[in-house]
């Protein structure tokens, strides 16, 4: 599409500016703050000739909503979140700057390894096997241009692709004096990395943006899914490969309670930290047995097996605070005391159940029950107690029972066809290891949604994060063409 190619250089400059903006969850900014992530997205969309508004979510956190109005009640939603996780230790990044937006290269080394080159720096790192498959099957060149920095891949490259697509669609409709047979809505949402408050405010209730604009009240199929609205959830991915499902997640906090005593007389106390260590070791060593206890409540055929990450955070005793400026710095007291409390977290990912989607709560409850039962049956407790509480949960998402069935869905079929035209190969279908905002769009808004879609890159939530520049531009073309396929032209 010529309208995309003509903006290729400009969108790269916009993307650099977005990467330079810190945008923590809940602190993405507001449209009237030109230096914030939200302010920059709003300003980038404003010249398109679309209708651009903001939607308050938190005190310093707004969704940006861009609308290209067409004819009729149908809608196609392009959703991309604007927040990014913290950078961690800044000294580990090239030149100590996680927000440099520096230009560079990624080189595929084979064996799930890449080298990231930025200036005089070269870093080697692992990538997901799904991304290695793209390099191995479809790429002859082993080096690709990148932009470097926290949030580049997850998720500012996606935001740039959406901006590029919306601008191209608006320009093409104006130049050709045509209208689409429905409305394209680009939702640049906040807080995906934490609670999902942005997507909920935009899509999930009658008083959400979609609800108040009438898009949630249209016809539905026999499973309750809307038939006049469809969507894609943009998130750092594998180069416009349609993701058709992801596992559910449940995050647990385990608290152990012991008895305090002076460290000089440890026999008079019960150490809650060593008690927690017993639980962590038991669950780590027994992960397969925990999954077996869940048994028939899981159907891993599409989304893969259950996994447990035990001890994702831990604190206890006299720990008061942890400061993360460079190397971690722990503020503590009571080093000379036996700790009477300890808390650790567990992140569990699990596939759908045999009666999905009607059994999503039952499946999650079976997973939590299996963890409790395993601790009760394997960890010897003497003088200490524990409790488990659920912090957060997200249901699994599966667009269909199998890859074959998902490939036959019109939304997925059209995306693969358009990606094939732009990329030179028709991508396979994949599932994602983690969650996206599509969870809420599918389970709450009941909108058919490609679960994850986006440009290639790597190392999200890690140091040396990068996004491939050409993939951002290719995405603008794919999204614009897909919007035309979904809505058609007005007669």
What are these regions (language model features)?
Residues 1-8, 23, 27, 36, ...:
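Metal-dependent amide/peptide-bond hydrolase catalytic core
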Residues 1-152, 171-180:
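Acidic/His- and Gly-rich active-site-bordering loop/insert found
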């Amino acid at each position: 599409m010529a309208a995309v190619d003509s903006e290729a250089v400009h969108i790269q400059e916009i993307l650099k500016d977005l990467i330079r903006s810190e945008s923590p969850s809940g602190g993405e900014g507001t449209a009237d703050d030109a230096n914030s992530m939200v302010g920059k997205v709003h300003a980038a969309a404003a010249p398109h000739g679309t209708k651009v508004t903001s939607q308050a979510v938190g005190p310093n956190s707004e969704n940006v909503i861009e609308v290209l109005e067409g004819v009729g009640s149908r809608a196609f939603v392009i959703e991309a979140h604007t927040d990014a996780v913290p950078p961690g230790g800044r000294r580990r990044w090239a030149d100590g700057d996680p927000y440099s937006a520096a230009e560079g290269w990624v080189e595929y080394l084979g064996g799930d390894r890449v080298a990231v080159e930025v200036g005089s720096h070269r870093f080697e790192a692992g990538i997901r096997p799904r991304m290695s498959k793209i390099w191995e099957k479809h790429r002859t060149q082993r080096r690709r241009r990148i932009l470097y920095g926290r949030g580049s891949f997850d998720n500012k490259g996606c935001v740039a692709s959406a901006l590029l697509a919306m601008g191209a669609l608006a320009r093409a409709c104006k130049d050709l004096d045509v209208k689409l047979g429905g409305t394209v809505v680009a939702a640049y949402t906040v807080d995906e990395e934490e609670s999902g408050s942005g997507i909920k405010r935009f899509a999930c209730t009658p008083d959400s943006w979609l609800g108040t604009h009438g898009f949630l009240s249209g016809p539905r199929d026999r499973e309750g899914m809307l038939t006049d609205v469809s969507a894609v959830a943009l998130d750092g991915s594998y180069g416009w490969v349609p993701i058709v499902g992801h596992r559910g997640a449940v995050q647990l906090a385990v608290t152990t309670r012991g008895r305090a005593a002076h460290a000089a007389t440890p026999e008079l106390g019960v150490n809650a930290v060593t008690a927690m260590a017993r639980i962590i070791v038991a669950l780590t060593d027994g992960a397969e047995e925990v999954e077996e206890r869940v048994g028939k409540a899981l159907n891993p055929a599409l989304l893969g097996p259950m996994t447990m990450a035990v001890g994702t955070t831990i604190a206890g005793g006299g720990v008061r605070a942890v400061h993360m400026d460079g190397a971690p710095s722990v503020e503590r007291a009571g080093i000379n005391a036996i700790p009477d409390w300890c808390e650790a977290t567990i992140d569990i990912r699990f596939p759908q159940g045999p009666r999905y989607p009607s059994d999503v709560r039952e499946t999650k409850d079976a997973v939590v029950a299996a963890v409790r039962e395993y601790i009760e049956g394997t960890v010897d407790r003497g003088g200490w107690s524990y409790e488990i509480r659920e912090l957060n949960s997200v249901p699994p998402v599966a667009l269909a029972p199998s890859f074959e069935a998902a490939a036959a869905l019109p939304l997925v079929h059209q995306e693969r066809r358009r990606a094939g035209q732009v990329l030179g190969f028709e991508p396979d279908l994949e599932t994602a290891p983690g969650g996206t905002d599509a969870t809420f769009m599918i389970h709450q808004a009941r909108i058919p949604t490609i679960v994850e879609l986006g440009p290639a890159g790597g190392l999200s939530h890690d140091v040396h994060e990068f996004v491939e520049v050409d993939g951002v531009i290719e995405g603008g073309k794919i999204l614009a063409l897909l919007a035309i396929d979904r809505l058609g032209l007005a007669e």
